[in-house]
Amino acid sequence: MSESTLHVRYLGKQDYESVWHAMQDYTDNRDASSPDQLWIVEHPPVFTQGQAGKSEHILNPGDIPVIQVDRGGQVTYHGPGQLVAYPLINIKRLKIGVRQLVTDIENSIVQMLEGYQVKAYAKADAPGVYVDERKVASLGLRIRKGCSFHGLALNVDMDMSPFQRINPCGYAGLEMVQCKQLGGPQTVEEAGERLVKTFSHNLGYQNLIHHQGLSESYE
């Protein structure tokens, strides 16, 4: 049954806009029987500005493009060495609300890092995952027709300097950290593999079907 099956798509390195439009298309065209999916991807350097985003939080983008997008939250950075995961989930079918989905995503990251003896936690007033008040994962979702898209970004082994060109998630002086510094997963592939396990467990998926890349129908 589709309720207990999660399709996991490994997209490799893909530009942000093409993946964004693909997840919009999937969400717009899905119906009650369309399977839930989790897309795992890395993006080239890009700043994305959420719907609540204020331009003053983009300090000095330089040669990195800024894209205005339709997710919640403020500005963030994506780049090589960062695990990006997009849960395309029918939350109406799962009978959970958006707050529960956010909590499940945050807990999936916290539990994954626990496996490396890294003590991470979420904050009620600032979505994402933190270690010693430094942010290791950012979160921004959109719900349309009872289904989620956009998702999370986990810093793994990347050039962190572009975060200094913005106020990450709208917080001036927020310090970012990455898994490599913390003794967590050392590669995006390793982090993705571990996160798929904790995420699917927390959302109650019993069957995982793995795919490489996107097909025209995404199914």
UniProtKB/Swiss-Prot annotation:
Pfam families: LplA-B_cat. It comes from the Bacteria. Residues 32-207 form the BPL/LPL catalytic domain. Its EC number is 2.3.1.181. Substrate binds at R71, G72, G73, Q74, V75, T76, Y77, H78, S138, L139, G140, G151, L152, A153. GO terms for molecular function: lipoyl(octanoyl) transferase activity. Keywords: Acyltransferase, Cytoplasm, Transferase. It is an enzyme of class 2 (transferase). GO terms for cellular component: cytoplasm. The active site is at C169. The keyword Acyltransferase applies. It catalyses: octanoyl-[ACP] + L-lysyl-[protein] = N(6)-octanoyl-L-lysyl-[protein] + holo-[ACP] + H(+). One of its GO terms (biological process) is protein modification process. Pathway: Protein modification; protein lipoylation via endogenous pathway; protein N(6)-(lipoyl)lysine from octanoyl-[acyl-carrier-protein]: step 1/2. In the reaction, the free carboxyl group of octanoic acid is attached via an amide linkage to the epsilon-amino group of a specific lysine residue of lipoyl domains of lipoate-dependent enzymes. Belongs to the LipB family. This is Octanoyltransferase. It comes from Shewanella sediminis (strain HAW-EB3). The gene is lipB.
